[in-house]
Amino acid sequence: MDYQQAGVDIEAGRSFVKTIKDNVESTYRPGVLGGLGGFGGCFEIPAGYRQPVLISGTDGVGTKLKIAHQTDQHHTVGIDLVAMCVNDILTSGAEPLFFLDYLATGKLEPEQLAQVVAGIVEGCKQSGCALLGGETAEMPGFYQAGEYDLAGFCVGIVEKSEILDGSQVQVGDVAIALPSSGVHSNGFSLVRKIIEMNQLSWDDKPAAFQGKTLGEVFLTPTQIYVQAIQGALKAKMEIHGMAHITGGGLPENLPRCLQANQSMAIDPSTWEIPTLFQWLQTMGDVPQAAMWDTFNMGVGYVVIVPAPKAAENVAWFKAQGIAAWQVGTVVAGQGEVLGLQ
């Protein structure tokens, strides 16, 4: 017996790397040293920094992958993977430099995984970061047929004096919201349960979604905010703090960019909750509090700025074609998010 008979096709793995090589290298930016295939990826720290600090992050896509498996649509989850990582490090003010991925599957299916990598490449291009390397692990007997798991890792850079860590946030500051593109990559265990409970298929087209299938709606990739936020930073917008609204929604993520003696008062009347979330709440009979605690509810990213600059900053985002609105105010408190009834 050999390794292939045991379920691991080494030649298929080599062929897969050759197939994706050009696509991966299309993400390269200044700083990348060498090419694909080495034991480690090399990246030169950009010039011009006095005290450069590297910011790292890692994340996955969660059970959203189950929808990709069940619909055989794999071209968007790679974007999700990059988005979940780069949006996180962006909150520190970091510019993403490079990205690494880990892809594990029971049996290597080249066409399927090429779709996944194409999505990762697209996410890296949207973020301006290089796909510096990755690992594709074929693990027979470990995953169900046709299924895979993903993990991503990114590294960015910021000047030490410009790190955003919440210490600059002051009572009276205003929170500016940037919209999400949908559920993003959190809350899918509840989403899938609601679909199952109502005996729906991912091919179904509820009237609420204007001709789109449930699969199309829920596989919409996570919005990447790098261009918007890096643009704001380069335009010298005075930003005191930022939050990426992921698992736990606004209640869990907003306090992460506040000081211990601060809370955030949110005004939900400042935006219309997207139809998608209203549909989920109705179909799943989900309590209002659970909706806020699980989903982003239409707010994907929050930027905290000084009150006198808030209107001007909202106008700046809109001038760049980015929807934005004033969503709340920093108040004295103990790390709570107020106003979400």
Swiss-Prot record:
Write one Pfam family the protein is assigned to.
Answer: AIRS
Query: Which GO biological process annotations does it have?
Result: 'de novo' IMP biosynthetic process; adenine biosynthetic process
Q: What reaction is this protein's catalytic activity? A: 2-formamido-N(1)-(5-O-phospho-beta-D-ribosyl)acetamidine + ATP = 5-amino-1-(5-phospho-beta-D-ribosyl)imidazole + ADP + phosphate + H(+)
Alphabetized, the UniProt keywords read: ATP-binding, Cytoplasm, Ligase, Nucleotide-binding, Purine biosynthesis
SUPFAM superfamilies reported in the protein's UniProt record: PurM C-terminal domain-like, PurM N-terminal domain-like
- What is any one of the record's Gene Ontology cellular component terms? cytosol
UniProt EC number = 6.3.3.1
Record keyword Ligase present? yes
Q: In which pathway does it act?
A: Purine metabolism; IMP biosynthesis via de novo pathway; 5-amino-1-(5-phospho-D-ribosyl)imidazole from N(2)-formyl-N(1)-(5-phospho-D-ribosyl)glycinamide: step 2/2
Example GO molecular function: phosphoribosylamine-glycine ligase activity
What class does this enzyme belong to in the EC scheme?
ligase
The record's subcellular location field reads: Cytoplasm
Q: Which domain of life is it from?
A: Bacteria
Q: Which NCBIfam families match?
A: purM
**What's this protein's family per the entry?**
Belongs to the AIR synthase family.
Matching PANTHER family:
TRIFUNCTIONAL PURINE BIOSYNTHETIC PROTEIN ADENOSINE-3, TRIFUNCTIONAL PURINE BIOSYNTHETIC PROTEIN ADENOSINE-3-RELATED
UniProt protein name: Phosphoribosylformylglycinamidine cyclo-ligase
- Its encoding gene is what? purM
